[in-house]
Amino acid sequence: LLHLDVDVLIPAALADSVTGKSAVGIRAKIIVEGANAPTTPEGDAILNDKKILVVPDILANSGGVIVSYFEWVQDKQNYFWSADEVKQNLNDIMMKSFREVEHMATDKNISWREAAHMIGVARVAEAHRLRGLYP
């Protein structure tokens, strides 16, 4: 399946399914990582060399974690949103995140995975700067 002639490939089941060996035969133009860690570092390097856009797992499959956070916030406030509000808030956050990663990748001429990691590290560093070391 990984080697089918498709526009978008979504590895969404297993970690390490896109390896150095399997990446060589991938013909998709875009890979959206639905699974956690579906691409090995060797596979990632080959995909980058082939100029295949990879939307990394930490961006592509973060919707579930975001909605879990929404549930926590609603429970804490005892104020519950409609399904449409949840979808709109999720869409807003996901689109903002996609734009940030795309901008960083383009601006720095790096992969989307590197951009997503850079943004994540910067956010943690800023939180640490503002709040101090959290136990």
Descriptions of predicted regions:
Residues 12, 24-135:
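Adenosine-phosphate binding glycine-rich loop
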Residues 1-22:
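A structured beta-alpha segment of the ubiquitous adenosine-cofactor-binding alpha/beta core
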